[in-house]
Regions:
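ATP-binding/phosphotransfer module of carbohydrate and carboxylate kinases, centering on a glycine-rich
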Residues: 2-55, 62-80, 84, 207-337
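Short glycine-aspartate micro-motif
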Residues: 29-33, 88-92, 156-160, 166-168
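Short, acidic, Ser/Thr-enriched surface-loop or helix-capping motifs
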Residues: 45, 101, 170
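Glycine/GP-enriched mid-protein hinge/lid loop-to-helix segment characteristic of carbohydrate kinases
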Residues: 53, 125, 129-236
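Glycine-rich phosphate-binding loop and adjoining helix at the ATP-binding site
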Residues: 58-60, 64-155, 283-295
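Short glycine-rich anion-binding loops that position phosphate/pyrophosphate groups of nucleotides
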Residues: 96-98, 162-164, 278-279
Length: 337
């Protein structure tokens, strides 16, 4: 865990001082996460340095066996790149979808509708290492809770509006979870009773059909050919082409503001952390907040803080692997009888 540096003698009696340095590569892990239609993986050390990366495009029509093979092919090359002498802590996965953490299964993901009850135990056996799972937003929020100590007090709502729409919530530093795996499905709640559009999830009138990037892309592409569907690439295109001034985005913003207001009225978090390429446009951000305040109790407005994160925020890399590092350190540091 540590190694000795230079010996320094200050001229006084006694043993000379020896500098001790942290061995940053003592423990490494792999984080796997989703960006639009891509699966990405990174090998990182306990300090958080990314040592190697891998990426693959995935089909929305893939099935359980396809996902298992893709994950093994994505992760194994990174395991082989661990530094000499390093211990491998395991793999942290952060996906969009519903997880049963007791059975260690991905129950359903709108992005991969053909996958049902995917077993992460099987993946763990294939990789011969520990595998931990979480939703993308849970992992991001866990990272924020580690990096921002004041988030540990009161309620924190993390809301994502991008290719899809979702949310997660923490109270006093603890992320709220559900044993069956269904919780905070913000993108799959109807905000317009007249909307009868069928969503990818199978429901009718979901918020995502009105505001998610995947639903807006066909109409945007009619006016702006070449609009990217990759969320990281979309932000620059969106800002440079001033898409936020169009009626399509303003309508979507109203729908998202109503969703946020409903969650706020139920949870009353002290802070609302926003992760969205759409809200990087200052005019759209201001419009969203005005719509939000119109739909929430005036006496609560002084109690909420809005915080914007850059859409490229990759906190899930660290949030999904923190427990792996903790587990490995405990094994090394606790004396075994």
């Amino acid at each position: 865990m540590v190694y000795e540096g230079d010996i320094w003698n200050n001229g006084k009696k006694g043993r000379p001082e020896i500098a001790l340095h942290m061995n940053e590569n003592f423990l490494v892990a792999v984080a796997v996460y989703v960006v639009s239609k891509q699966l990405k993986a990174v090998l990182l050390n306990i300090k958080g340095d990314v040592l190697a990366e891998n990426m693959v495009n995935v089909s929305s029509q893939m099935e359980n066996e396809d996902l298992l093979g893709i994950l093994v092919e994505l992760i194994e090359p990174l395991k082989q790149k661990k530094p000499v002498g390093a211990m491998f802590a395991g793999v942290g996965l952060s996906f969009f979808g519903n997880f049963n953490k007791i059975r260690q299964e991905l129950i359903f993901s709108m992005r991969w509708p053909n996958i049902k009850n995917f077993s992460f135990k099987q993946l763990s056996d294939s990789l011969a290492c520990e595998v931990l799972i979480s939703t993308s937003l849970e992992a991001k929020l866990n990272d924020l809770l580690l990096d921002e100590p004041h988030y540990g007090s009161g309620g924190t709502l993390l809301y994502h509006w991008g290719y899809g729409i979702g949310a997660t919530y923490a109270m006093n530093g603890v992320v709220v979870e559900s044993t069956p795996g269904y919780i905070m499905e913000a993108g799959h709640v109807a905000v317009d009773l007249n909307n009868e559009t069928k969503c990818r999830c199978g429901n009718i009138g979901c918020l995502e059909t009105e505001a998610a990037l995947w639903a807006l892309l066909p109409d945007l592409a009619k006016v702006f050919p070449g609009v990217p569907e990759n969320e990281d690439e979309f932000k620059e295109f969106y800002l440079s082409h001033h898409l936020g001034s169009g009626e399509l985005i303003l309508h979507a913003t109203k729908a998202v503001a109503l969703s946020l207001a409903s969650l706020y009225q139920i949870l009353h978090p002290e802070r609302v952390v926003l992760l969205s390429p759409f809200l990087m446009d200052e005019a759209v951000y201001d419009f969203m907040k005005r719509q939000f305040y119109m739909r929430t109790s005036p006496y609560t407005h002084g109690d909420v803080e809005f915080i914007r994160l850059e859409p490229e925020f990759r906190g899930e890399i660290y949030g999904s692997t923190a427990q792996l590092f903790k587990n490995s350190l405990q094994k090394e540091l606790i004396v075994q009888d």
